């Protein structure tokens, strides 16, 4: 079992229940899922690009990503409906906790010129979205085997009712927010 999951069950639930005055532990916000999304627009011209993106995403997430396709044709981007333009993976359960642990302890400290995560990236319902500019911050990616540096979006979906609860939940997991 992931250390963060144990920490959540043992200490975070009690702390948040006390802080927000919940009558039941089931009211305490929890992390529902983590979604990783990588837009690969260059895949329209070169199919190999999508294979590399899928390989990187599989290594990072530990599960096979789904290929996302264009919903409609856009002449300006030279894409047609149904063209593969990205990949995404949704992590839940044990894999989600393990990924969160690696993100907080290993990946985020490896971001170049890192000054803290923006606290403004909450969506109003306690969910947090962040962007990563390069996939090489994850230890699973071998720098010599990548074809190109790609970024990705990471969305942490919580059961929090508002941003304050979501922020308190992520703070409890030592997320490095800007002061």
From Swiss-Prot:
Role: This is one of the proteins that bind and probably mediate the attachment of the 5S RNA into the large ribosomal subunit, where it forms part of the central protuberance. In the 70S ribosome it contacts protein S13 of the 30S subunit (bridge B1b), connecting the 2 subunits; this bridge is implicated in subunit movement. Contacts the P site tRNA; the 5S rRNA and some of its associated proteins might help stabilize positioning of ribosome-bound tRNAs.
Family that this chain belongs to: Belongs to the universal ribosomal protein uL5 family.
Q: Look up keyword Transcription regulation and say if it applies.
A: no
Q: Which gene encodes it?
A: rplE
Q: Which Pfam families match?
A: Ribosomal_L5, Ribosomal_L5_C
What organism is listed for this UniProt entry? Shewanella frigidimarina (strain NCIMB 400)
What is the name of the protein in this document?
A: Large ribosomal subunit protein uL5
- Which Gene Ontology molecular function entries are recorded, alphabetically? rRNA binding; structural constituent of ribosome; tRNA binding
HAMAP family, per the entry: Ribosomal_uL5_B (MF_01333_B)
NCBIfam families from the UniProt entry = PRK00010.1 (NF000585)
One GO biological-process annotation of the entry reads:
translation
Question: Entry's PROSITE patterns?
Answer: RIBOSOMAL_L5
Complexes and interactors: Part of the 50S ribosomal subunit; part of the 5S rRNA/L5/L18/L25 subcomplex. Contacts the 5S rRNA and the P site tRNA. Forms a bridge to the 30S subunit in the 70S ribosome.
Task: Mention any one GO cellular component term assigned to this protein in its UniProt record.
Answer: ribonucleoprotein complex
Keyword annotations of the record: Ribonucleoprotein, Ribosomal protein, RNA-binding, rRNA-binding, tRNA-binding
Q: What InterPro entries does the annotation carry?
A: Ribosomal_uL5, Ribosomal_uL5_bac-type, Ribosomal_uL5_C, Ribosomal_uL5_CS, Ribosomal_uL5_dom_sf, Ribosomal_uL5_N
């Amino acid at each position: 079992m992931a250390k963060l999951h144990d920490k959540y069950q043992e200490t975070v639930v009690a702390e948040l229940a006390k802080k927000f005055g919940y009558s039941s532990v089931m009211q305490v916000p929890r992390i529902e899922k983590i979604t990783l999304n990588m837009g690969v627009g260059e895949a329209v011209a070169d199919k190999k690009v999508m294979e590399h993106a899928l390989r990187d995403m599989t290594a990072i997430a530990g599960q096979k990503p789904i290929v996302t396709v264009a919903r409609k044709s856009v002449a300006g981007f030279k894409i047609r409906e149904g063209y593969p333009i990205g990949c995404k993976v949704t992590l839940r359960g044990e894999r989600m906790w393990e990924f969160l642990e690696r993100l907080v302890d290993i990946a985020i400290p490896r971001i170049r010129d890192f000054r803290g995560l923006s606290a403004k990236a909450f969506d109003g319902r306690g969910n947090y979205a962040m962007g990563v500019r390069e996939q090489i911050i994850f230890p699973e990616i071998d720098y010599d085997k990548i074809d190109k540096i790609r970024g990705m979006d990471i969305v942490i979906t919580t059961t929090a009712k508002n941003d304050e609860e979501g922020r308190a939940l992520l703070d409890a997991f030592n997320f490095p927010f800007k002061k």
